[in-house]
């Protein structure tokens, strides 16, 4: 009976307790290793139980467990030793998976390139969502169509341009040649020269040389144009071409001419008032000087007269008219020139009026001087021929104007009364 049950169990499964384990992937860590150990232990127990059953008729725990599985005890919970492995038999956890094995869900197409400093995307030839939609490159939103054949060439161009822009004269500027002199046979390196010489590609020696062989011709470097010209465009040993030198001289002379014109205009403006207010001629000055001398001599002759003497001075009318005719014409500043017919008459009248005022002042001064000497009365009769514009033309020969000037002088208790009579003849 016992043997039949064991045979039935062995026909179904070599491990009768295998079905008792809960199904599910990864239920136990290191399941394969633990299963092999359990199988070996079960086989040894089965052989020991069979020996005990046939020879000693003792109780077999493994056989009881099998009976409970296939008998009426299928609803009982499994034994705890069958669910958990001993700690010594537990396998270590598996190592973490390497990064290359973690592939993304969307694989990049073979046409996609991600260089160090730029990204280039191309239209993929394969199917798929990316191929159908098409990718947009970094070319300002435009589609980039590159075949796999020109991939390396495009990468070189991009890397060269980007490296040259980022590092300056580093990677990109490695192929840049330094500036050299353009004169034949010179080819001097201008890397350490001045900026002017580097810019125009000429060394300092050939920039100042009178004759330079450049481009197969005898030329000279122009300082104004900053380039080479043939020798026929220069004047003798000049370092500037004829055209630019003429322009330079014209620019320099233009301010000088303007300054000269301004100075001449200023001189003319200053000379205009001087010409308008210049002194009278020599004849007029001599005439005025002679008249003043005559007045002074007359006053000197009258000064020693005593207080009791009466003096009458009468000048011939003809002589006065002749002297008036001989006197020059007096001009007034800012006045309009007189007419030719009335010019001598108006000038003579103005001069006579001025002379009359001077005579009157001289006589008055003499009277005051004589009056201060002693007591008595001084009577002076002055006869002069005066032509005045203020007098009427209908005057006769003997218009007499009496002017009585009473001057009271308190000098030593004496009163001096002076009576001045002026007789004007027309």
Swiss-Prot record:
What InterPro entries does UniProt report for this protein, alphabetically? SBP-like, SBP_dom, SBP_sf
Residues the record lists as binding Zn(2+) 2: 222, 225, 229, 241
Q: Which domain of life is it from?
A: Eukaryota
> What are the UniProt keywords, alphabetically?
DNA-binding, Metal-binding, Nucleus, Transcription, Transcription regulation, Zinc, Zinc-finger
Which residues are listed for Zn(2+) 1 binding in this entry? 181, 186, 203, 206
This protein's GO cellular component annotations are: nucleus
Per UniProt, the short sequence motif Bipartite nuclear localization signal occupies residue numbers: 238-254
Region Disordered: start-end pairs:
268-290, 392-426
List where Low complexity composition bias occurs: 268-287, 401-417
Molecular function (GO) terms for this protein are:
DNA binding; zinc ion binding
Per the entry's comment, what about the domains?
The SBP-type zinc finger is required for the binding to DNA.
Q: What is this protein called?
A: Squamosa promoter-binding-like protein 10
- The source organism is Oryza sativa subsp. indica
């Amino acid at each position: 009976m016992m043997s039949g049950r064991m045979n039935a169990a062995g026909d179904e499964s070599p491990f009768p307790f295998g079905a008792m384990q809960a199904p599910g992937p990864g239920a136990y860590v290191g399941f394969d290793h633990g299963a092999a150990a359990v199988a070996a232990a079960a086989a040894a127990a089965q052989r020991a139980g069979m020996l005990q059953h046939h020879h000693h008729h003792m109780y077999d725990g493994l056989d009881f467990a099998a009976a409970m599985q296939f008998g009426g005890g299928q609803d009982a919970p499994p034994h705890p030793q069958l669910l958990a492995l001993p700690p010594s038999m537990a396998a270590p956890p598996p190592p973490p998976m390497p990064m290359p094995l973690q592939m993304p869900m969307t694989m990049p197409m073979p046409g996609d390139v991600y260089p160090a400093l730029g990204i280039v995307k191309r239209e993929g030839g394969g199917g798929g969502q990316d191929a159908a939609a098409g990718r947009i490159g970094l070319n300002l939103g435009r589609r980039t169509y590159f075949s796999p054949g020109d991939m390396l060439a495009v990468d070189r161009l991009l890397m060269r341009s980007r490296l040259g822009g980022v590092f300056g004269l580093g990677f990109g500027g490695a192929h840049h040649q330094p500036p050299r002199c353009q004169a034949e046979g010179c080819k001097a390196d201008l890397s350490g020269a001045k900026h002017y010489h580097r810019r125009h590609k000429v060394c300092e020696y050939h920039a100042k040389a009178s004759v330079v062989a450049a481009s197969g011709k005898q030329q000279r470097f122009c300082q104004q144009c900053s380039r080479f010209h043939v020798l026929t465009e220069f004047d003798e040993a000049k370092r500037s071409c004829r055209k630019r030198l003429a322009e330079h001289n014209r620019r320099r002379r233009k301010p000088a001419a303007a300054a000269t014109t301004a100075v001449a205009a200023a001189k003319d403006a200053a000379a205009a008032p001087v010409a308008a207010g210049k002194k009278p001629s020599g004849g007029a000055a001599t005439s005025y000087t002679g008249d003043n001398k005559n007045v002074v001599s007359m006053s000197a002759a009258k000064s020693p007269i005593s207080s009791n003497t009466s003096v009458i001075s009468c000048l011939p009318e003809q002589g006065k008219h002749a002297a008036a005719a001989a006197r020059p014409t007096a001009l007034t500043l800012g006045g309009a020139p007189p007419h030719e017919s009335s010019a001598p008459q108006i000038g003579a009248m103005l001069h006579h009026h001025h002379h009359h005022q001077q005579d009157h002042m001289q006589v008055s001064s003499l009277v005051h001087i004589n009056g201060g000497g002693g007591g008595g009365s001084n009577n002076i009769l002055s006869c002069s021929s005066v032509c005045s514009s203020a007098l009427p033309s209908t005057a006769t020969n003997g218009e007499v104007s009496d002017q009585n000037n009473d001057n009271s002088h308190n000098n030593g208790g004496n009163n001096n009364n002076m009576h001045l009579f002026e007789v004007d003849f027309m």
